[in-house]
Amino acid sequence: MKQFVKRFICGVLLVTTVCAVAGCYKDEAKTVAEERTPTSFRAIAATNASVEDKADLMVKNMSREDKIGQLILMGLDGTTLDEPQKEMMRKYRVGGILLDNNNMESKEQLRAFTKGIRDNANIASLAPPFIAIHRERMPYRPNVMIPWVEPNIISKKGLDAVGSLATRTSIEMRDLGFNLNLGPMVNTHSFYSYTQDLDRAAQIGELITKRYAVNQVFTAYQFFPCGADFTVPGMRVDVSKDALMDDDTRVFVQLIQSTAQERPMIMVNSVKVTSMDAKNPVSLSKPIITDWLRGELGFTGVGLSADIGYGATIT
């Protein structure tokens, strides 16, 4: 339980810090109960409105606590959803859950676990939660999931092989109750890269995202603006913006354009790109996230930070 609370507090700290630095709290009138339509998220989802109108209505219907909770993606302990964890989700209006190998025993157990997460959200009138996993980095667990072939190996087998694996794993994820994959890795200099070719990396990222979208599973490209050893808190990347645009960032530019309809997320790195922001890691950098990724490159989707344990909030 102590470890669970620690992981949750880390998530809250991450959200609070990112919002404060990136300026996502704007000078606008506070939302009060009388201004919100007292309609449940399930009722909104059942209407005949367009997806965009449903989303707008859901946001309008949210309290400030709901909106902050939507920014939290937290981990859980154990293989069942116990009462303290349910209460934590309800109290802080948590918008997403990240499961890992330690949460999994079997397909039946995992289906029950993810169903419990959804049911808890429904009971508390929460927005449908993201239930996520690092699919590409799951250890070999044949009793739980299809093994993911090493990226550099599957890439050499061709795009058909990549597409087939993406289709099978996305169907499996959907059936197990997941709706978000924290991947694919689209950097070209990582030990987990599919390829060192920029255009090929963009092709693979696009293919995986489109196959996952068919099965109602979102993806989150890793890691903007470049690959680096993000496990080292405070690591610096001394490279110019132009050099990045000729390297991994070019992959993101292509993917932002080619998969806009699928609405993938982008995971940002926690390293410091000193040429653009000498003080803050990418995950806290307004010049990099707001001005560059959103302003210049036109990304309008959801941005995710790296784990707080990897220095996502260390300046």
Give residue ranges: language-model regions:
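C-terminal motif of bacterial Sec signal peptides marking the signal peptidase cleavage site
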Residues: 19-23
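Active-site mouth loops of central-metabolism enzymes
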Residues: 70-81, 150-164, 234-247, 311-315
